[in-house]
Amino acid sequence: LYRVFLLNPERTDYLKLYRAHRTIDWKDRFNLLWVKPDDVDNAYAFACGQLQFAMKCANKARKEAENQCKHRVIPRSINKDGSLRVIHPHDWCSGFFPGSLWQVYAYTNDDFWRQEAISNTWMIEEAKWHKGTHDLGFMMNNSFGKAYQLTGERSYKDVVLQSAKTLITRYNDKVKSIRSWDHNRDKWKYPVIIDNLMNLEMLFWAT
């Protein structure tokens, strides 16, 4: 109905029907092809509210003694007791939160989100030396890579390049792939899982 209205804006009756009967599933990646711009704005507004609450909870969690001792700095998920789970920079999910902040900044161009993205991104810088994971690609590319894409600042680029140098140490020329996991060596000789594909983007970009 909305697509018909776009073709003929005079048919406001179609727009009224669309608004009355629409069912939006944000999990449907094709949904954004035909939803109204207002709906995208509303989705980002909702995301901003969630991220602001997450940042508030994260700031509180970072002050807890156990998290400070174990250098847990980035929010990841909710624990069973309802508390916020914060993680070490080496956790494979560490780049998702700062990456989400950069995505919101890219859409809103609001300096508030830029500053929050900068702060949360640099919290995981040390991961650029972490050779124990194949997930370094999307850990650092979603955060520092997105930061460089949006700002052009050399400092972000340098981190991504070092991350790529670290990740390529997991490459085996005989297998022609980076190694996925280091554990369970008694079961797997050289594990390569499909997630590897998400980590190659940073390597291709770096070359």
Indicate where each model-derived feature is located.
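Glycan-recognition and catalytic cores of secretory/periplasmic carbohydrate-active enzymes
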Residues: L1-T207
